[in-house]
Amino acid sequence: MLKFLSKIGDYTKETIQSARYIGQGLAVTFDHMRRRPVTVQYPYEKLIPSERFRGRIHFEFDKCISCEVCVRVCPINLPVVDWEFNKELKKKQLKHYSIDFGVCIFCANCVEYCPTNCLSVTEEYELSVYDRHELNFDNVAMGRLPYKVTEDPMVTPIREFAYLPEGTLSGHDLPEPAKRAGQLPQDIVKTLK
């Protein structure tokens, strides 16, 4: 009889423990059901890149003076600059400029150190292709400006990270009157309207 009662007691404890585990799992599920979705429906919705986002490099052929500073500051010596010396003008003339974005680490040193500002960083990050040789952009391909996310008619720009808790985007331990570096995404969208 004692053995029977101990088995009933063990069964009851296991049942209560199982119910507790199921309750904990359901509590987590219901907690997540109250939140907004975290995922972005990518081809149709895109986040607005931040001000400091480093995407594909834009090149302006007319501004380039063939100084090759971009090649010297690049950690992997990536930009290819072909030029010839014009004896009449007594200066270098650019013939061809290219960057292989399959190798580029998007550090933007070339943009930062360019003396004529012929290089700039765009917000384009969709560089996927089927053949990696197509990632070798010449001066014509780099001269094209991409669509901005906010101007693309086929895309709904996501204005902010709505799922983050309040105060996450503010500066850490800064006094109230201190200015925050950069702009919040919702402020960028307000300026575009």
Curated annotation (Swiss-Prot):
Its cofactor is [4Fe-4S] cluster. It is found in: Cellular thylakoid membrane. GO terms for biological process: photosynthesis, light reaction. SUPFAM superfamilies: 4Fe-4S ferredoxins (SSF54862). Residues 55-84, 95-124 form the 4Fe-4S ferredoxin-type domain. The keyword Electron transport does not apply. It is a peripheral membrane protein. GO terms for cellular component: plasma membrane-derived thylakoid membrane. Its EC number is 7.1.1.-. Keywords: 4Fe-4S, Iron, Iron-sulfur, Membrane, Metal-binding, NAD, NADP, Plastoquinone, Quinone, Repeat, Thylakoid, Translocase. It is an enzyme of class 7 (translocase). [4Fe-4S] cluster 2 binds at residues 74, 104, 107, 110. NDH-1 shuttles electrons from an unknown electron donor, via FMN and iron-sulfur (Fe-S) centers, to quinones in the respiratory and/or the photosynthetic chain. The immediate electron acceptor for the enzyme in this species is believed to be plastoquinone. Couples the redox reaction to proton translocation, and thus conserves the redox energy in a proton gradient. HAMAP family: NDH1_NuoI (MF_01351). This is NAD(P)H-quinone oxidoreductase subunit I. It comes from Cyanothece sp. (strain PCC 7425 / ATCC 29141). The gene is ndhI.
